Structure formats: structure tokens, C-alpha cells
UniProtKB/Swiss-Prot annotation:
<keyword id="KW-0378">Hydrolase</keyword>
<feature type="domain" description="Acylphosphatase-like">
    <location>
        <begin position="3"/>
        <end position="92"/>
    </location>
</feature>
<dbReference type="Pfam" id="PF00708">
    <property type="entry name" value="Acylphosphatase"/>
</dbReference>
<feature type="active site">
    <location>
        <position position="18"/>
    </location>
</feature>
<dbReference type="InterPro" id="IPR001792">
    <property type="entry name" value="Acylphosphatase-like_dom"/>
</dbReference>
<dbReference type="InterPro" id="IPR036046">
    <property type="entry name" value="Acylphosphatase-like_dom_sf"/>
</dbReference>
<dbReference type="InterPro" id="IPR020456">
    <property type="entry name" value="Acylphosphatase"/>
</dbReference>
<comment type="similarity">
    <text>Belongs to the acylphosphatase family.</text>
</comment>
<feature type="active site">
    <location>
        <position position="36"/>
    </location>
</feature>
<dbReference type="InterPro" id="IPR017968">
    <property type="entry name" value="Acylphosphatase_CS"/>
</dbReference>
<protein>
    <recommendedName>
        <fullName>Acylphosphatase</fullName>
        <ecNumber>3.6.1.7</ecNumber>
    </recommendedName>
</protein>
<dbReference type="GO" id="GO:0003998">
    <property type="term" value="F:acylphosphatase activity"/>
</dbReference>
Length: 92
């Protein structure tokens, strides 16, 4: 099991990025969350098998059709700082 904390920059709010991320993460059997940041970025915590997380990170560079991803910052995540472990992937 691996956990990644992700910040996505670009045109990623108001284009369905969070709903798309939830659908894609669920399809890959990942748990965690995704949310909008006040500065216009999207933040996510991804948990799951390493290959599935890597695949999701690759997909996040593209995003949904209306998104324009400029940059993704990925750090090793620690879910302990973000509350109890989730059993699903949610938009917060």
C-alpha cells in the first residue's frame, strides 16, 4: 500500500476535475480524497497499490477534457495527518 499527496496546478477548477478524479480513482480501487484549494489548485490524497497509484498519477497529468494541467507536485503522503483511513474515494 502506498500513499501520495498531490497538488495539481492549471485550469483544474470548474472543469469537472474532482468528479473525474473520483471516478478514475474508484476505477483503480484507490481510496482517499480530492478537494479544491483556495489558490486555484486541486489537492488529493491517493491510497492503494503502488501500480494503481502510479497509473492514477499519470492520468492526473491529462485530467478531464476541459482541464489544462500545468504542473503536478507529488509527495509521499501520510494519511495519519488527514484523519482516519477511508474505505472509498471522496470529493471533499
Amino acid at each position: 500500500m502506498t500513499t501520495k499527496h498531490v497538488l495539481v496546478s492549471g485550469i483544474v477548477q470548474g472543469v469537472g476535475y474532482r468528479a473525474w478524479a473520483r471516478q478514475e480513482a474508484t476505477r483503480r480501487n484507490l481510496t482517499g480524497w480530492v478537494r479544491n484549494c483556495a489558490d486555484g489548485r486541486v489537492e488529493a490524497l491517493l491510497e492503494g497499490e503502488a501500480d494503481a497509484v502510479d497509473d492514477m498519477l499519470n492520468a492526473m497529468h491529462q485530467g478531464p477534457a476541459l482541464a489544462q494541467v500545468d504542473r503536478i507536485l507529488v509527495e509521499e503522503g501520510n494519511n495519519d495527518d488527514d484523519g482516519p483511513r477511508s474505505t472509498h474515494f471522496e470529493v471533499t
